[in-house]
Amino acid sequence: SPSGFWLGARGPAIRTLTLAELKAYDVGRVNPSTSYGKQWPMQLARDGERIPTLAEVFGFVRARGSSVRFNLETKITPTSGDSVVDPETFVKVAVAEIRAAGVADRTTLQSFDWRTVVLSKRIAPEIVTACLTAEFPNFDTVKPDGSGRSPWQAGRDPARHGNSLPRLVKAAGCDQWSANAGS
């Protein structure tokens, strides 16, 4: 929290905060008592770290003369409702920052929510895109809902592609596919 304590409950939606309010949060370590924290017990704590803007990340890399490739994952979901901006606004802002920094040729934009990937490819075909999928008991972006489609796949109908996930990825226009599965 801005006062230096772990959030005891879900915090405010990020989109409701000003940049100054967002930067008040110390994000330099994960709470080790949470399930997420227990997944990463070796995480190096960096107390006092603030959330950088995308432009600040690009500037940080540029200041070091680096030619790092950027693998940017959009953290937006089809189940977020109005707690996040709409996918088109999200992608337009991200693409504008990528282009302003002159790093489109070394950026991959990836997401489990293919809406952002499809929009990115339409708006900025020069940016490499990656469709992500997950098939886990507690997180499945492949399993269809009652409509026969997964809300994660930008409205794509698997039946129109032989119920083949690789064909669905290709039809979405993704340059890459990263599949995650397990138990």
For each predicted feature, which ranges?
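Metal-dependent phosphodiesterase/phospholipase catalytic core, i.e.
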Residues: 1-118, 122-137, 146-182
